[in-house]
Amino acid sequence: MYIDTGIMSNNIFLFAFFALVGLTRIEAMPTKGSEGTWDVDYEDQEHTGITCRENEHYNSTRIECEDECNDRNNKLCYRFQQFCWCNEGYIRNSSHICVKLEDCLKDEEQKSETLASSANNDSSKRLEDDLKLFSHDSVSHTSLEPETQAQKFNGIINEETLDLVFGKPENSWAENKPLETKTQAQKFNGIINEETLDLVFGKPENSWAENKPLETETQAQKFNGIINEETLDLVFGKPENSWAENKPLETKTQAQKFNGIINEETLDLVFGKPENSWAENKPLETKTQAQKFNGIINEETLDLVFGKPENSWAENKPLETKTQTQKFNGIIDQYTRSIVFVF
């Protein structure tokens, strides 16, 4: 059998060449040392000047992308030190450090808990702000409520309960402020005083009283200034079985609260009953009028203010304008009263 020595020598040469290349590749591959660490490819490291960190090894042949905790789709390639690869059982976290796989999962759970806690805190703060917005302390005055409010106090209507309904302004001139409608009270945030009453009921020019009694100029003008039983009934309404043709200045709704019965008992509930009052049904007076007589309100002082004609249908005629008083230069006696209040 003839063997071509030339071909054989060529084959031996090729075999020796590939064997040498194979040994070089084996020498270049990293070898695993102690647990979790790798021997470094010192030859290539010296050539490139790259030093891998803890839990990393050098891999000069790396061509694929490396996984990390928050990117498992191998889309982010070569974003860290080139050719440094996490050791087996390790993975890069968000801080670019190689950590154990279980530590990576814990890190993700902590992130989720932090985000959830932050969202809950934001929600709780918004709820707390909403509660503060509608808290009782943020309301300066209690607004007037419907009839239900009166029922809250078992039907007792006095200074205390009215203050709860309408609100009590500081330095209030009247302990028992007049009963106003819900809309009127709300216009002034529950403050019922000389200024707000003038805004509600109107203030005539050169008024002798800073607080005009509870009648608007329009109502007085409707009847050419004549204020008597007939005109008052037209303005305020006349309940059936009324004990007084000239009922106090109440609205229809207020009168209906007591089934149209207006007497000593119901008026005391509405207006309050002052001590040593000469009359259980005290008319609505202004602060100025009361001060004229040092706070003494009795038959004599009221006659001086309102006048008392003989056979008068009302002993204390309310609703007198300054104009009537001014006609006589402020002199109110039997003669002037007879001209004002026709006997």
Curated annotation (Swiss-Prot):
Any Pfam family hit: TIL
Keyword Signal: yes
Domain of life according to the entry: Viruses
Keyword Signal assigned: yes
Gene3D superfamilies: Laminin
Domain TIL: 52-104
Keywords, alphabetical: Host-virus interaction, Inhibition of host innate immune response by virus, Signal, Viral immunoevasion
Alphabetical GO biological process terms: symbiont-mediated suppression of host innate immune response
Signal peptide positions on this chain: 1-28
Function: Counteracts the host humoral immune response by inhibiting the processing and the amidolytic activity of host PAP1 and PAP3. Thereby, melanization of host hemolymph, normally producing several reactive intermediates toxic for viruses, is deregulated and proper immune response cannot occur.
UniProt similarity note: Belongs to the polydnaviridae EGF-like motif protein family.
Description of how the protein assembles with itself and partners: Interacts with host PAP1, PAP3 and SPH2.
Protein known as: Protease inhibitor Egf1.5a
